[in-house]
C-alpha cells in the first residue's frame, strides 16, 4: 500500500507564513541592527535567507544571516549515522546579538538542542529565540519555538516534508502517512 500524501501548505501559503513570521520577529526584536538569523542546514538555512529578505522588505534593514551545521553536536549519530558535514557559515561574532534559530520542522527537539550547543562555539548571544515553519509536536525535550508558522498535530510515524524552490524545485509542505 502506498503512503498517503496531503499538502499542508502551498507555495502561496508558505509565502504568507514567512511574511507573518518575519513580522513577528520584528515585533519581538528591540534593535534590528543586533538581529541575526541562523538557519539550521539544510532547509532552515534557506528559510533564514527568505526571512531576512522579508524583514528587509518590511523594515528596510539588512539582517545578518548565517547557516549552522549541527552534525557533530547531535546525540543520535549512532541511530542516524554520520552524514557528510556541511561547514557552518557564521562570519560574525554572536556575542550580545539577538539570535533567531530557524528550522523547517520541529519534532522531538533534539535538532534544536544540538543547535543550541553549536551556537556557543560562536559567542554568547544576549538572547536565542526559535522560529520554525512547522511544529508537529511530540517533543522529548523542554524546547518550545517562539515563532511558529503552522502547528500541525501528527502521529509519531507520520512524516512532514518541506520542499523549497531553491533546493527542491518547488515550495510545499506535505504530510506523509498511511
From Swiss-Prot:
Keywords: Glycosyltransferase, Transcription, Transcription regulation, Transferase. SUPFAM superfamilies: PRTase-like. Belongs to the purine/pyrimidine phosphoribosyltransferase family. PyrR subfamily. This is Bifunctional protein PyrR. Regulates the transcription of the pyrimidine nucleotide (pyr) operon in response to exogenous pyrimidines. One of its GO terms (biological process) is regulation of DNA-templated transcription. A motif (PRPP-binding) lies at residues 99-111. It comes from Nostoc punctiforme (strain ATCC 29133 / PCC 73102). HAMAP family: PyrR. It is an enzyme of class 2 (transferase). Its EC number is 2.4.2.9.
Amino acid at each position: 500500500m502506498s503512503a498517503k500524501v496531503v499538502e499542508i501548505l502551498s507555495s502561496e501559503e508558505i509565502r504568507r507564513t514567512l511574511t507573518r513570521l518575519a513580522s513577528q520577529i520584528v515585533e519581538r526584536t528591540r534593535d534590528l541592527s543586533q538581529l541575526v538569523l541562523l538557519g539550521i542546514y539544510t532547509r532552515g538555512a534557506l528559510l533564514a535567507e527568505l526571512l531576512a529578505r522579508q524583514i528587509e522588505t518590511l523594515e528596510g534593514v539588512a539582517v545578518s544571516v548565517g547557516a549552522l551545521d549541527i552534525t557533530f553536536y547531535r546525540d543520535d549519530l549512532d541511530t542516524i549515522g554520520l552524514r557528510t558535514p556541511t561547514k557552518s557559515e557564521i562570519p560574525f561574532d554572536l556575542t550580545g546579538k539577538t539570535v533567531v534559530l530557524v528550522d523547517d520542522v520541529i519534532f522531538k527537539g533534539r535538532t534544536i538542542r544540538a543547535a543550541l550547543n553549536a551556537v556557543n562555539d560562536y559567542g554568547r548571544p544576549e538572547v536565542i529565540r526559535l522560529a520554525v515553519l512547522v511544529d508537529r509536536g511530540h517533543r522529548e525535550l523542554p524546547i518550545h519555538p517562539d515563532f511558529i508558522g503552522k502547528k500541525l498535530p501528527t502521529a509519531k510515524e507520520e512524516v512532514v516534508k518541506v520542499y523549497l524552490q531553491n533546493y527542491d524545485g518547488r515550495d510545499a509542505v506535505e504530510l506523509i502517512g498511511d
